[in-house]
Amino acid sequence: MPKDRTRRRFLASDVQLVVERSSEHPVEYAIVLLVLRNGRWGTVRTFDNAHDPSEHHEHAYVGLEKQSPTVTYGPVNDAMYAAELKLLRDWRDIVHAWEHMQ
């Protein structure tokens, strides 16, 4: 299903959380933590279920390079809630770690 719903939330002037999801079932989603550096938005962390509705990936990034995911299984709503909550609670630490791996 195409992701036809997008919600953006600025966590700081240079950090945003973007949630994209499909309206129809099975729900496909991507939840992305973005950071503005040197005039460009870069991805720091991605959560998605691109391969299967019940297979959830968490991708960290080193620079621009996506790392192998941590994979979990379960209901879409639970995974989306957990991903968004993790980013809302821990975004400062996640961004700090990403900046020190550049």
Kindly give the residue locations of the regions a language model identified.
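A short, structured beta-strand/loop element
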Residues: 28-68
